[in-house]
């Protein structure tokens, strides 16, 4: 369906206190909505103060990983030098643990988005800071397109993201850009007048909720001194999670196993093939076992089991 002349679409905006059904209906129609005041001023201030030292540490030249060696396919190695990312938010942020992960409206919308597949959980929580000169991203979707999980228009959601502004988002500083209606088509409709580009300019504390099927990109930070900061809160359904959990196993027992066996019970990271080809189940964008100092092939008294 073509867009009538003179009716340029806009990203719909809602207060954090708005009716969840109304917000979700707009989200289904457009693949994206802006929630104003998603974080309160107090939450925003406290969270930024929790994150500041870690970003400053990286700006001084330190890597987010605790280890010198990065796993093959580490996301860290793919980032432009102007961009810094902080992961493992639950490990140090009280606001993240107690406020953000319990956000009432976030859960109301997630329950609706994943109604067809059941429970959902955090896929990735990261603070992303784009400094001056951070280049424009290529157009992409967040939802992977591998055949086993490929979901096109009209199918269940494979991922949603509450992409929350921790500083003001302006076009000049590279505010996120979207292809209107692209969650309803196959492919990337670049240059299609029926899918014009929209820019999510926001105030700090606002959040843009986007479908994993929506084509988008981060814009060029064309400022000389502004660091655009965001919280990426990616949520995914639990349907491809292993049936059995091995989180209860003792570390000495796990360290008696080979790295391959450790990966089979989710004590090691995994990799996926191109076009994404990044590590999965990681810590600080690196191999989780390496970050934890996990040993392998260690002696173990089997009689203690």
Swiss-Prot record:
Its EC number is 1.14.11.-. Pathway: Secondary metabolite biosynthesis. It holds the Pfam family PhyH. Keywords: Dioxygenase, Iron, Metal-binding, Oxidoreductase. SUPFAM superfamilies: Clavaminate synthase-like. Belongs to the PhyH family. This is Dioxygenase hkm4.
